[in-house]
């Protein structure tokens, strides 16, 4: 046999042995997570914005599972808070006004000042910023959660947080609050 074939066979056998060892170790030392934490995390919006006072949605889910309040997630809003309260078996509370943003704001990039460094793109947890290296960037306002994480990394300070204008598209319509009268159809004779 040539030296190359022997080397390939030896490396293949080593790879198989190490693969089996790693597979065994992964099963033997597997850490089981809290299923309640997983359920709570599934309900959270996964923006990783930190507005709740925790560094991301997973740490906040762990805190809720350990007894923290369920009303600290502004991006999730009242609907998420009610689902969390139902899951935890507690009474729904209004969103914590010290944590919640009163007026929804979104990031706005002054494109004429943008140098295209991509630091804001890397900081955005919901991929709401478009752009590429050395080119201007822009924000997709429909995706922006207003978490403010893109402002600090900007080296030229060209990102502003502006309130969302109230239009028919952004208005919080409460259609269930409008009474609807059901009309009975006349049957043909």
UniProtKB/Swiss-Prot annotation:
The record's remark on the cofactor is: Binds 3 [4Fe-4S] clusters.
Q: Where is this region: Hydrophobic?
A: 1-26
Positions with a binding annotation for [4Fe-4S] cluster 1: 49, 52, 57, 73
Q: Does the keyword Kinase apply?
A: no
Q: Which cofactor does it need?
A: [4Fe-4S] cluster
UniProt cross-references to InterPro entries, sorted A to Z: 4Fe-4S_dom (IPR007202), 4Fe4S_Fe-S-bd (IPR017896), 4Fe4S_Fe_S_CS (IPR017900), Elect_transpt_cplx_RnfB/RsxB (IPR010207), RnfB/RsxB_Proteobac (IPR016463), RnfB_subfamily (IPR050294)
Every copy of the 4Fe-4S ferredoxin-type domain together lies at 105-134, 135-164
Residue ranges annotated for the 4Fe-4S domain, each copy included: 32-90
Q: Where in the cell is it found?
A: Cell inner membrane
The GO terms this record gives for MF are: 4 iron, 4 sulfur cluster binding; electron transfer activity; metal ion binding
Tell me, what's a Pfam family for it?
FeS
Q: What SUPFAM superfamilies does the annotation carry?
A: 4Fe-4S ferredoxins
Cite the EC number: 7.-.-.-
**UniProt feature coiled coil, ranges:** none
Q: Where does [4Fe-4S] cluster 2 bind?
A: 114, 117, 120, 154
Q: Does the entry feature the keyword Transport, yes or no?
A: yes
Residues spanning the membrane: none
NCBIfam families found in the cross-reference section: PRK05113.1, rnfB
Function, please? Answer: Part of a membrane-bound complex that couples electron transfer with translocation of ions across the membrane.
Family in the record: Belongs to the 4Fe4S bacterial-type ferredoxin family. RnfB subfamily.
- Assembly mode: The complex is composed of six subunits: RnfA, RnfB, RnfC, RnfD, RnfE and RnfG.
Q: What is this protein called?
A: Ion-translocating oxidoreductase complex subunit B
User: Which species is this record about?
Assistant: Shewanella pealeana (strain ATCC 700345 / ANG-SQ1)
Q: What is the lineage of its organism?
A: Bacteria, Pseudomonadati, Pseudomonadota, Gammaproteobacteria, Alteromonadales
